[in-house]
């Protein structure tokens, strides 16, 4: 019963990875949209995009870490 709860909890924790994937897609979609509107701001927008990508991906990595902790922690 405990093993089933661990597997279920890990599966639910990986839902955060889907959110991270959507978030990264939205970040880069906003970069493409903004660059097409004002190409001269591309260097500044790209640095903001990389920051947004890193923060969004960190949430996904935290979700993955929680899934591994639920599966393999004692």
From Swiss-Prot:
Subcellular compartments: Mitochondrion membrane
Gene3D superfamilies: F1F0 ATP synthase subunit C (1.20.20.10)
CDD domains: ATP-synt_Fo_c_ATP5G3 (cd18182)
SUPFAM superfamilies recorded: F1F0 ATP synthase subunit C
Gene Ontology terms, MF aspect: lipid binding; proton transmembrane transporter activity
Topology of this chain in the membrane: Multi-pass membrane protein
Any one Pfam family match given in the protein's UniProt record, by short name: ATP-synt_C
Residue numbers marked as site, Reversibly protonated during proton transport: 57
Keyword list, A-Z: CF(0), Hydrogen ion transport, Ion transport, Lipid-binding, Membrane, Mitochondrion, Transmembrane, Transmembrane helix, Transport
A GO CC annotation given for this chain: proton-transporting ATP synthase complex
InterPro entries tied to this protein: ATP_synth_F0_csu (IPR000454), ATP_synth_F0_csu_DDCD_BS (IPR020537), ATP_synth_F0_csu_sf (IPR038662), ATPase_proteolipid_c-like_dom (IPR002379), F/V-ATP_Csub_sf (IPR035921)
GO BP field: proton motive force-driven ATP synthesis
Residues that span the membrane, as ranges: 12-32, 50-70
Assembly with partners or alone: F-type ATPases have 2 components, CF(1) - the catalytic core - and CF(0) - the membrane proton channel. CF(1) has five subunits: alpha(3), beta(3), gamma(1), delta(1), epsilon(1). CF(0) has three main subunits: a, b and c.
Family the UniProt entry places it in: Belongs to the ATPase C chain family.
Function: Mitochondrial membrane ATP synthase (F(1)F(0) ATP synthase or Complex V) produces ATP from ADP in the presence of a proton gradient across the membrane which is generated by electron transport complexes of the respiratory chain. F-type ATPases consist of two structural domains, F(1) - containing the extramembraneous catalytic core and F(0) - containing the membrane proton channel, linked together by a central stalk and a peripheral stalk. During catalysis, ATP synthesis in the catalytic domain of F(1) is coupled via a rotary mechanism of the central stalk subunits to proton translocation.
PANTHER family per the UniProt record, alphabetical: ATP SYNTHASE LIPID-BINDING PROTEIN, MITOCHONDRIAL, ATPASE PROTEIN 9
Protein name per UniProt: ATP synthase subunit 9, mitochondrial
Organism: Rhizopus oryzae
């Amino acid at each position: 019963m405990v093993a089933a709860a661990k597997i279920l909890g890990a599966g639910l924790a990986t839902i955060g990875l889907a959110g991270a994937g959507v978030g990264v897609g939205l970040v880069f979609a906003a970069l493409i949209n903004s660059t097409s509107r004002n190409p001269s701001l591309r260097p500044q927008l790209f640095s903001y995009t990389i920051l947004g990508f890193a923060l969004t991906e960190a949430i996904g990595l935290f979700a993955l870490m929680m899934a591994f902790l639920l599966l393999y922690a004692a």
